[in-house]
């Protein structure tokens, strides 16, 4: 394996950062809300059985649309679906942070789920396009590690954020990270 075929150029590193940031946020938001549910149920004066829909809405939308967005990525391009997904995700994160009712938060989470599904559906395809074939396994491994660590770290990150601020910050944190991924992805993917 020659060095020039497997060497990464800085542009590729930043493109990978954009993809990994986006998948990290999408996975984190699936697990980060568990810790906040009692607070949300209290703040919105809903039962715990109803509050769980804040999580379920997000997960159900991802599950129902993941394959459809992957197919759209094949048709319209992975980059377009990825950037659209990040845009939707960031906008919905802002709406979640500004939510003042249970229904507004749940609807915002549904919209956020559409953005996350866009990102998740084309994530590995973008990794495949960024990494040279000789080191594609490394790229897939890094991607899998980010997904696993994000899922496992979600409750701990949520607990840390909630000790410092309100539940709104669980969504506000997505905005600068998402905008960074959007700008980098727009320039380098």
Model-predicted regions and their roles:
Residues 2-187:
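Transmembrane-helix bundle of Major Facilitator Superfamily
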């Amino acid at each position: 394996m020659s060095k020039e075929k497997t060497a990464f150029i800085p542009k590729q590193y930043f493109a990978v950062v954009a993809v990994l940031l986006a998948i990290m946020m999408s996975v984190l938001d699936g697990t980060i809300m568990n810790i906040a549910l009692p607070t949300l149920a209290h703040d919105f004066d809903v039962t715990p059985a109803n509050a769980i829909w804040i999580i379920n809405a997000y997960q159900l939308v991802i599950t129902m649309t993941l394959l459809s967005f992957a197919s759209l990525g094949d048709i319209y391009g992975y980059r377009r679906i990825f950037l659209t997904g990040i845009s939707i995700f960031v906008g919905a994160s802002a709406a979640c942070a500004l939510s003042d009712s249970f229904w507004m938060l749940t609807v915002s989470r549904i919209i956020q789920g559409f953005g996350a599904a866009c990102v998740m559906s084309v994530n590995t395809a973008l990794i495949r396009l960024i990494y040279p074939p000789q080191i594609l396994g490394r790229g897939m491994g890094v991607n899998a590690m980010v997904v696993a660590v994000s899922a496992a770290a979600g409750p701990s990150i949520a607990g840390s954020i909630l000790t410092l601020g309100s539940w709104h910050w669980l969504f506000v944190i997505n905005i600068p990270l998402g905008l960074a991924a959007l700008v980098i992805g727009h320039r380098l993917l």
